[in-house]
Amino acid sequence: MNFAEYNVKDANLEEVLLALKSLDTVEAVALGGSRSTGASDENSDYDIYVYCAEIPTAETRENLLGKYCSIAEFGNHYWESEDNTVMNNGVPVDIIYREVDRFGRYIDTVIKGGKAFNGYTTAFWHNIKNSKVLFDKTGTFTKFRDMAQIDFPENLRSAIIKNNRNLLNGKLPSYDRQIK
């Protein structure tokens, strides 16, 4: 499989993608971040999003992918379930895992329901809208991406501002009180 048309021009990463594809629970893999939008440079990492029926254990992922990495932290949860790695050739790769059913409910809630969440509502939307499908066994990711190809709804914009404004200042859990 040749991923070059998707701005993946790294043989080591192609092997990782093929290894991920071999897992039964993996339904789709997409390229996100600057590599998917054309804004990357020679220092850019790869952001790989793996959509699964069930997220493989960190141990399974380490056994499958560890041989391709010179440095790796499997099973991090800073933002989502993720593996933060540097490939054997020195290229940094973040691999983010999403459960299809759970993520599908989240997308429905945001896009169809207009519900805002703290901080990352627009980031998730941008990610889905601009990611490149590397493979999609079931059509799941393509469905998510197609849902995101609409104009940003006014009710969601208003909900994001209202929801996140309270985090900035004036409330007990606001950021301004936390950093004092």
Briefly describe each language-model feature range:
Residues 1-30:
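Helical scaffold of the NTase/Pol beta-like nucleotidyltransferase catalytic core
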Residues 2-5, 69-179:
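Conserved NTP/Mg2+-binding pocket subregion across the NTase superfamily
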Residues 16-17, 61-63, 154:
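A short alpha-helix capping/helix-coil boundary motif
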Residues 26-27, 46, 75-80:
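Accessory alpha/beta interaction modules
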Residues 26-40, 133-141:
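Short N-terminal helix-initiation segments at or just after the protein's N-terminus
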Residues 32-67, 82-97:
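Catalytic metal-binding acidic patch
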